[in-house]
Swiss-Prot record:
Enzyme Commission code(s) on record: 3.6.5.n1
Species the sequence originates in: Xanthomonas oryzae pv. oryzae (strain PXO99A)
Keyword check for Protein biosynthesis: yes
Compartments where found: Cell inner membrane
GO biological process: positive regulation of translation
Domain annotation tr-type G: ranges: 2-184
Protein name, per record: Elongation factor 4
Amino acid sequence: MRNIRNFSIIAHVDHGKSTLADRIIQLCGGLQAREMEAQVLDSNPIERERGITIKAQSVSLPYTAKDGQVYHLNFIDTPGHVDFSYEVSRSLAACEGALLVVDAAQGVEAQSVANCYTAVEQGLEVVPVLNKIDLPTADVDRAKAEIEAVIGIDAEDAVAVSAKTGLNIDLVLEAIVHRIPPPTPRDTDKLQALIIDSWFDNYLGVVSLVRVMQGEIKPGSKILVMSTGRTHLVDKVGVFTPKRKELSALGAGEVGWINASIKDVHGAPVGDTLTLAADPAPHALPGFQEMQPRVFAGLFPVDAEDYPDLREALDKLRLNDAALRFEPESSEAMGFGFRCGFLGMLHMEIVQERLEREYNLNLISTAPTVVYEVLKTDGSVIPMDNPSKLPPLNNVEEIREPIIRANILTPPDYVGNIITLCEEKRGSQIGINYLGSQVQISYELPMAEVVLDFFDKLKSVSRGYASLDYHFLRFDPGPFVRVDTLINGDKVDALSIIVHRSYADRRGRELCEKMKDLIPRQMFDVAIQAAVGSQIISRSTVKAMRKNVLAKCYGGDVSRKKKLLEKQKEGKKRMKQVGRVEIPQEAFLAVLQMDK
């Protein structure tokens, strides 16, 4: 155990952690030069296209240090986007140290601050690394000063590297060996292993990535999953180098994969503890906190026959994505589907993209909404993630919305624009700190305002320089109403939205105008109305197409023409009573693009 080092890399999006990982793998001889490709650990095609890391990945590498000893480096790559912060907390729980990678040209950004605090809270040794020093705009001294001012850790010994050119990567490895402590033995000698991640393999069943805290796991031993109480027989164990390599055992302090022929998707929950069935550990490891989904949306198959396939696909994704929640839902407008919970809009986009690509599903998604708390008149509090499930208003005492604390880091030039944006979004300012060349702005904002398009607007008002990190604070009561959309007098449940009362008229008007452009013309007038309760607040009409029934009458008696027009009017009236209006997918997305 003395020569094992477990570490992860934390950084903001685009500060170069996957490239640094590539260089570390190359220098330790994990892959031959011909097998190397850029971002070797970002294995998912969506990760490679968007240039972001979504899933944490792990590699075990042997490294011969300058003192002649061979060290085993277990390295877990982590994502940088705020939506995937739960992946980071999970990876950090399995490590003793972390490399904090900061772009020397851009300086400290909000997500690296948040992840660094998580690492310090978990008692990890943080080693600062300044990347991209080959750029002409890199300023190492300023970046060091920012790390000390914004994060508050000593950056005097920060290693300055260029991951792209490979400069000083050997110094990073020496810093890992000498500054990150080895795993400490636990107070029990019984097997305890933390499940960091699980995924489904078509041939092997469930494969789990584990960090062995104490004891050892061998093929043939019977393990117990502590939360479910089920036992499984271990088939194979091994490590990633980054290729999958089988071993005879995984010992204390090591990070590797195990395959215990678990065929059930929920057999190895992430964050759970494994122990030996014959000689179990007295208690489970303190896992990381369960992430609560913050954004909910309905996912419905375009073809109703795909419903079982969608359920199976979500089950498999859930194994690999601990924060995804879903439950069956039926909608009058859309048929059968699932109500899914996500961590944020990027998470939602990526889940939908993975379902469509990896499982060949054609999906419709409804407008995303946050979770509100509803206090009923009988004193009970219920969570509400679907506007159409709001109880009748005479049973509702108050509606509470989720409030978040946002930390924004920005250059001083854009402070005015950002404050204006936050005020527009009903924010209340907590404080402003000037830290060297950066300004830290803290705001309390309603989550509903942040989730949809706040991130995009923040980037545009600051020309891409501001960065955002947020965490949930509390629920606050407010004057909220539900705006329903009626098409020809029928309520469309999938288009209901919850808004602040002061915005209801404007949102209703915008929604009606948007829908008018999107619903195709029929042979009869289509009335689109927005209503709060029984009061109609806005209306627009899609005019009917008209067939010229008088075309065949050349001159002649006017009563003949009247008769034909009356007949047409009767037919339209009858058609309107039985006619159904098809609502296209774009109409459901119109709710999203209201402010644009």
